[in-house]
């Protein structure tokens, strides 16, 4: 009798392990989105103003996220010497007409101490405002290797971002619990949970959604795309069951934003297709103001991130309506970059947008529907 080959035993063991992990995910009904809030026109006339969130406290500042909690905008971002450096930390600030002084709320040392494991670096944060008033913060950390070996950590605040709980590590993958990253905001579900867009960079670049209950139990994990060139999905729902996702494209030119659709609240997604929107391998942000149109912030370029624009449209037709930042000079000793937008809508009807300004600062724009509709 021939012995069983080692590779067969290895594959069988992996299959059993993966199957057991899948069984640990609770059985649940299909998700249902909370319907988008209908925000009436303010009838105040056009309003637009700009503010600095960060002011060169660190050499670089990047990957901001914004959320509204109890009517107050709160922003987070990471800053330090440069992306991936050991001194990079997560910072937070809140807005009440002006932005408060940035506060460091997490770094590799505090994360390492809380998790009891070595942390090499931290990165991308994203905020989520729970319906019960909690403010959640997801951010990535790496123990060994690059971003492809990331894990997601979670903290929360009960006082509009003034104080935060110690981080916990979410278990999102059966394979060493690595290669899951966040960038964009989650969507609220009718059962109180959240559908969090995530992506992977290990053995490819592809997008997923992670469905979490209000107590952070992993309820489901759904693949959005496959392959090596689609990441950082930005998702918004159109009603209780349908949603659109726009994905950053990192493949061969021409660079275009990828789009996907779901008709069952993210239980299944269509095959990604290229839109007509340019994408220079850069993140986008999408929201549904609830007025019959969608709003998208993007770098509408095939190369470079020196222009940041707003587009209005529907599922498959988009029009650039505003150019927010643009630098056309070519004789500079550096490249300008206005990138990684994050948008949200307040109960007062104002749209808030934060983004990386030239890799050095975080900038905030506040505007209303009337300003968007100006020619």
Summary of predicted features, one role per range:
Residues 4-375:
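Asp-box/BNR beta-propeller blade signature and adjacent active/binding-site loops
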